[in-house]
Amino acid sequence: MNLYIYNTLSRKKERFVPLNCKSVKMYVCGPTVYDIPHIGNARSVVVYDLLYRVLSFLYDRQNITYVRNITDIDDKIINRAKELKINIFKLTHETTIKFHEDMSYLGCWNPTIEPKATDNIDVMINIITSLIQTGNAYSTDDGHVYFAVKTFQDYNLLSRRTFDSMMLNSSESSEQQKSYFADFVLWKPANADNEDIDAVFDSPWGKGRPGWHIECSAMSYKFLGENFDIHGGGADLIFPHHTNEIAQSRCAFPKSRHASYWVHNGFLTVKGEKMSKSLNNFVTVRDLQKQNINGAAVRLMFLSTHYRKPLDFNDKSLNDAKNIINYLYDTIDSVNVTVQQQDNTKAEFKGNAFTVEFINALLDDLNSPKAIVCLLNIAKQIRRQNQSEYKLALTQALLYASNLLGILHNYQFIKDSNDVKDNSNVIPHEIDLLIAKRIQAKQDKDWNLADQIRSQLLSNGISLTDKADGTTSWKVIK
C-alpha cells in the first residue's frame, strides 16, 4: 500500500517515501494562542489529524513522530494580554487549555510532541547566531536581526513568487533598517510597550523576542532534526511563513533539505470569503458545542470536502454531516454491536473487500469525500443484509473505517444523550470539555484536579475509562 500526497513544493501528487522506511516525522504549524479557535482554525487541525491517522495505519502510531507547536509569543498575544490586563503567560496557558478542549471535542489525537515557542528561545538564538556568522543574516543599530533573502538563491522555490510581485504587495515600513525590502525579521528588540508584560528575552542583540518564522525552524530542528518527512499548515502559510522557514533552515543547515513534502489545506469560507476574526465572519468551535452538536458531525463536515479545496460553511453542510453521522450510528446500533466489541485486526481490515475502496480513497491524497461515500455504501449493505455473520463482518469494517476517519469518538454521544439528559446534571458537550480539562490536568501533573473532575462526573452518573493511547471514553451508569 502506498500513500500519494500533493506536494506544494513540486506542485504535483507524489508517492510518499519517508526518509526512514519504518518511521515518519511530521511537523505541523500549530495555534497562536491569543484566543479560542474558530472552525476555520479547527479544519486545519482535523486535516492533519486525518493524515496522522492514515500514517499510523500504514506505519503504526508508535512509529510516527508528530510535532505540532504552540506559538505563545506573538504581537496578537501581546496586544490581547494588554487589552485584558493580564500576564501574557496566564493568557497563553488558559487559551492552550481551551484549544485542547476544542480539539478533543472534534476527536483529534494529541500530537506526539507539542512544544511551546517560549520553551525553545535558546535554540532560536543559536540558529540566528549561526545565520549571522554565515552571512545570511545581519543585525541593525535598533536591535533587529534580519534574514538576507538574496543570500538564498532558492528563496522563491515554494511560493514561486517573483521579487517584483512581492514588492508590489509589500506593506513593510520604509523606515526599517533593512538592506532589502523582502528581508524578514529574526529577532525583534524590546520596547516600552511590551517590556512590562514578560514578552522579552535576553539575547546577544539585547532584550527582545524572536520573529514568528524562526520559531518553527527551531522547533522542527530540535524535535525532528535537520531533515524530516512532512511539513503541514494552511494554504495562507505558503508565503511568507513556510517560504521563510525553508530559507532559514536550509541556510542554517546547508546540507539539509528541511521537509521533503509540503502539505497545505484550503480555507474555510463563509459566503465565499475566508473565515477570519478580522472580518468578523467567524464561528468558534465552542459556538457549535453550545448548540449540543456532536463533534463527530463537525469533523465529518470538514472531511466532506477535499482538504486542498475551500470549504464553505453553512447550515446545509452542517445538517448534511449531522444526518450522515446519525445514519452511521443508527446502522451500528441496528446490528447490536458496540465499538468496544470490534475485534478485527488491521491486517484483516487491509484485506477486507468491503474496505479496499475506502482505503484506496484515503491513500489517494486523503480523498475523504470519496471515503465517506464508501462508508455510506457499507452502511447501506449492512441495512440490506439478512445473513448475520456477513452483516457482522460488514459492521466491523464500518467501525474500523469510521474510526480511521475519526468519527467514532462521540459514538456514545448519540447513544447515551437521552440517558444523560434524564439521569445527569451534565450535558454531553460539557462532559467532553471536562474530559479534555482532565487530560490537560494529567499532562500538567495536577493529579488533584484530575481526580476532582473524575469524581464530579461520577457523581452525575458518568463513568470514565482511561485508554492506553491517552484518550478517555465515558458512559452513563445505569
From Swiss-Prot:
SUPFAM superfamilies assigned to the protein according to its UniProt record, in alphabetical order: Anticodon-binding domain of a subclass of class I aminoacyl-tRNA synthetases, Nucleotidylyl transferase
Motif ('HIGH' region): 31-41
Main location, first listed in the record: cytoplasm
Compartments where located: Cytoplasm
Reactions catalysed: tRNA(Cys) + L-cysteine + ATP = L-cysteinyl-tRNA(Cys) + AMP + diphosphate
Residues binding ATP: K277
GO cellular component, as recorded: cytosol
Protein's GO biological process: cysteinyl-tRNA aminoacylation
Motif interval(s): 'KMSKS' region: 274-278
EC number: 6.1.1.16
Cofactor(s) required, per the database record: Zn(2+)
EC category name: ligase
Binding site for Zn(2+): C29, C216, H241, E245
Free-text comment on the cofactor: Binds 1 zinc ion per subunit.
A single GO molecular function term of this UniProt record: zinc ion binding
Domain of life: Bacteria
Keywords: Aminoacyl-tRNA synthetase, ATP-binding, Cytoplasm, Ligase, Metal-binding, Nucleotide-binding, Protein biosynthesis, Zinc
Keyword RNA-binding assigned: no
NCBIfam families: cysS
Subunit structure: Monomer.
Family, as annotated: Belongs to the class-I aminoacyl-tRNA synthetase family.
Protein's name in the database: Cysteine--tRNA ligase
Organism of origin: Orientia tsutsugamushi (strain Boryong)
